[in-house]
UniProtKB/Swiss-Prot annotation:
Motif extent (Cx2C motif 2): 244-247
Annotated protein name in UniProt: Anamorsin homolog
Ranges where the record places region N-terminal SAM-like domain: 1-153
Subcellular location: Cytoplasm; Mitochondrion intermembrane space
Keyword Iron-sulfur: yes
Naturally occurring in which organism (per UniProt): Vitis vinifera (Grape)
Gene Ontology, cellular component aspect: cytoplasm; mitochondrial intermembrane space
Amino acid sequence: MLQNSTLALTDHEVLSISTVLDAVRKLDNAGVDQCDPLIITQASSLSQLPVESSSLDIVISICRSLEFPCDKLLAEISRVLKPGGTVLIQKTSQSVAGIKDGETSLERKLLMAGFLEAQAIQLKPVVPSEGAQSFGIKAKKPSWKIGSSFSIKKAEKSLPKFQIEDDMDLIDEDSLLTEEDLKKPQLPVDGDCEVGSTRKACKNCTCGRAEEEEKVEKLGLTMDQLNNPQSACGSCGLGDAFRCGTCPYKGLPPFKLGDKVSLSGNFLVADI
């Protein structure tokens, strides 16, 4: 097997070394003076390159056919190039429109073959002829190997740490209370009036019974009528709409006969 740092492929029958070196110079290669390229002519019939894998720095393809190099040959070029190696494909067109279409098609073809950084460059035609113009596309083989893998370390998230000082001043809740707050509340007396079958308000009544009796007196009702309401007509408990003009229960809310009638504290207080 032949080995060399630079390989030139062409579908021409003859290709001069100077043409290959001019193409190498377009790649800004500093070692072009020491370059001794390997040239393969009529390479369109090749299905495999006679070069070891990952042994070349540069592969140059100078062709006149639009189908050269084919997809299979591009895969071979990728095989023989070192990781990060450069490939240059030079073609000829008779029109400016053909150059634009050829560059676009060739860039897409190289990207589909796995090459990176496809870029168009201007080149001299291999065979000078009237109206013929050359164009070239250079690209690079990825610097990593196909099928290589590496592990990605997941960044560990640390929870924020809060420092609590043990000697922090704590407020005693009892110190917030005043002397008035500490006094025991006095519960109201249930009833200090006389206890019996007929309870009446005492002289110094403080439980509110005197006020209730005063309201009853204004209505003209007796305590017996309130405690045991009776009705001769049977309509007194239905409400004012059914009561007669002299009904003693007029003004009271509806109630059931036989139930004790209770007055609210604001029964006789004016609304306005």
